[in-house]
């Protein structure tokens, strides 16, 4: 794909003019319904298997990085190595109302062992990905404390296959954590 085409695609997938958690949620859900996966799991790729032996598609998963890192990843066709497991993503949506950005940063740092999450800027930007078959669900989960003191748990997924297909990126933009 030509560089201009990649630039246009990256720009068209950016979530803009969204000021609340609810607006971001609606935008991502709409994009999720409209998308047509451009890649299918191939032979030799990791897949989640549920208790009855069928493949699970976790749907949209989220990568938290800063915007320049996301741009480099997209244009370079690769995911960042942001944990000891390779690329780490989660089902924590970037519009979660009852959790602060600082708490998300703490949870990502603890889950990944990655020093980059010391700075909240590292988790203030998201990429919503549709990557069936590329990621394996980890045994551990990310545990966060809500703004009301409740325990929240989110699944973690990882892959050491760091190739990123342009069709895997559903949307990207600024997180709207803690915005009620």
Swiss-Prot record:
InterPro entries: Glyco_hydro_41 (IPR006065), Glycosidase (IPR006064). Residues 26-37 have a biased composition (Basic and acidic residues). GO terms for biological process: carbohydrate metabolic process; cytokinin biosynthetic process. Residues 26-54 are annotated as: Disordered. It is an enzyme of class 3 (hydrolase). It holds the Pfam family RolB_RolC. The keyword Hydrolase applies. Keywords: Cytokinin biosynthesis, Glycosidase, Hydrolase, Plasmid. Its EC number is 3.2.1.-. Transmembrane segments: none annotated. GO terms for molecular function: beta-glucosidase activity. Hydrolyzes cytokinin glucosides thus liberating free cytokinins. Contributes to the root inducing activity. This is Cytokinin-beta-glucosidase. It comes from Rhizobium rhizogenes (Agrobacterium rhizogenes). The lineage of its organism: Bacteria, Pseudomonadati, Pseudomonadota, Alphaproteobacteria, Hyphomicrobiales.
